[in-house]
Amino acid sequence: MKLGIKKVKMHVKKNDMVKVISGNDKGVSGKILRVFPEKNRVIVEGVNMRKRHMRPTQEYPQGAILEREMPIHASNVKKVS
């Protein structure tokens, strides 16, 4: 374990259904796609969408602007059964 980083037990895990209880997306439900226990953050499907600018590649010769989910704090979600 690195200095200054504590491993925190998360109340949710990947593929759990959760509901956002605070923030801009309050009331939205979705599935957890990824968990970051060291930062106490989660990525929820369809929540906290942000635009990412991609530079030109073989896949995107002109470059692209993609919408992706960004992490939110785990305390802002509640598990839904």
UniProtKB/Swiss-Prot annotation:
Keywords: Ribonucleoprotein, Ribosomal protein, RNA-binding, rRNA-binding. GO terms for cellular component: ribonucleoprotein complex; ribosome. It comes from the Bacteria. InterPro entries: KOW, Rib_uL2_dom2, Ribosomal_uL24, Ribosomal_uL24_CS, Ribosomal_uL24_KOW, Translation_prot_SH3-like_sf. NCBIfam families: rplX_bact (TIGR01079). Part of the 50S ribosomal subunit. PANTHER family: MITOCHONDRIAL RIBOSOMAL PROTEIN L24. Belongs to the universal ribosomal protein uL24 family. This is Large ribosomal subunit protein uL24. It comes from Chloroherpeton thalassium (strain ATCC 35110 / GB-78).
